[in-house]
Amino acid sequence: MVVVAMAAAAPVFRTTPSSRRSAVAATADALAAGIFLGAGLIHMLPDSAQGYWTYGASYPWPFVICGATIMGLALLERLAWGSGRSAAPALAAAIALAAHSFLAGAALGATSRQAAILVLFLALIAHKGAASFSLAQILTDSSLSRRRAMIVQSAFVVALPLGVVLGAVATRQEQAWPLVKPTILALGAGTFLHFGMQRHRTTAQALGIARQLAPWCGFALMALIAIVD
C-alpha cells in the first residue's frame, strides 16, 4: 500500500498531471465503494457490537462510535476543501485523509476474518492510490513549499501501516484490553461506511453499466464472505 501511495503521488510532484482517469480505475473505485459499505455494515459493525455485548455493555456504544466517526470525518473534509492557495486547507486535507488511512489500517489490523482481510486489502490499495494522488494535487496547488508538501505527503503514506500495527497489537492484547478491539472495529466501520458513501456518491452519476453494477458486486462479495468465512 505504501508503494502504491508513493507511486500515485510521484507524477504530481514531478509535473502537472492530467485530471482524466482511466475507465478501469473508475470501475475499480466503484467496486471499492461497495466493498467498503459491505465491510462496515456486514463485518465490522456486527463484530464490534458482539464484542461489547460479550463484556456486558448494554448501551449501543458501537453504533454511537460508528455514527460519530462518519460525522467527524465528514466535518474534517468540509474544513479541508477550502478555497484559495492557503496552506491551511491543504494541511486540513492531509489531516483528514491521514485520519481516514490510520483508522482504516487499525480496522484492517483488528479484523480476524481472513477472506475479508484479503478483499479489503485489495480495495484499500485502489482507494489509497486515488487518495494519495488527490492529496498530492491539493498540496502542490497550495502555498506550501515543495519540500514541506512532500513531508506532509509522506506522513499520509505511513498513516495506514501505523494503523495496521495498532490494530494488530490491540488484537493480541484482547484479554488485557477487552474493549479496545471492538472500539477499533466500530471506528473502522464508521470509516469504511464514510469511504463507501463518499465513493458511491461520486460513481452513482457515472455513465456505463460496469460502473453502475460495480458497487453492487462489491457489496454482494462482502455479503458472500460473511457466509463462507
Name these PLM-found stretches.
Residues 1-229:
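Intrinsically disordered, metal-sensing/regulatory segments
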